[in-house]
């Protein structure tokens, strides 16, 4: 007896089409187009999860650099002075301080000023 793929195919298609919700036009409605677009989308999602970490680090460095420049210190010299002073604040915290609590950032900067040459 020949086995038909009715239930299996429907489940497989339903799974793909469920993941394709929110896509535009036929990429949402037609199985083959949805499958192709989903494959691309998953690749972009995988790549951009890695890229997001790099982007945020660049943003934090830019913000810290801007706050340092207001006090006449370069970013690289500030980070070097932090290492010499054994202050273990990460860039995310420093950037948040530079944006939201400039007085605290200036206090950290003042505490490492003597390490700068």
Swiss-Prot record:
Ranges that cross the membrane: none
GO MF terms here are:
rRNA binding; structural constituent of ribosome
Entry GO terms, CC: ribonucleoprotein complex; ribosome
* Cross-referenced PROSITE patterns: RIBOSOMAL_L20
GO BP terms, alphabetized? ribosomal large subunit assembly; translation
Q: Which Pfam families match?
A: Ribosomal_L20 (PF00453)
Which InterPro entries does the record cross-reference, listed alphabetically?
A: Ribosomal_bL20, RIBOSOMAL_L20_CS, Ribosomal_protein_bL20_C
Q: Which UniProt keywords apply?
A: Ribonucleoprotein, Ribosomal protein, RNA-binding, rRNA-binding
State the protein's purpose.
Binds directly to 23S ribosomal RNA and is necessary for the in vitro assembly process of the 50S ribosomal subunit. It is not involved in the protein synthesizing functions of that subunit.
Q: Which family does it belong to?
A: Belongs to the bacterial ribosomal protein bL20 family.
Task: State what protein this is by name.
Answer: Large ribosomal subunit protein bL20
Taxonomic classification: Bacteria, Pseudomonadati, Campylobacterota, Epsilonproteobacteria, Campylobacterales
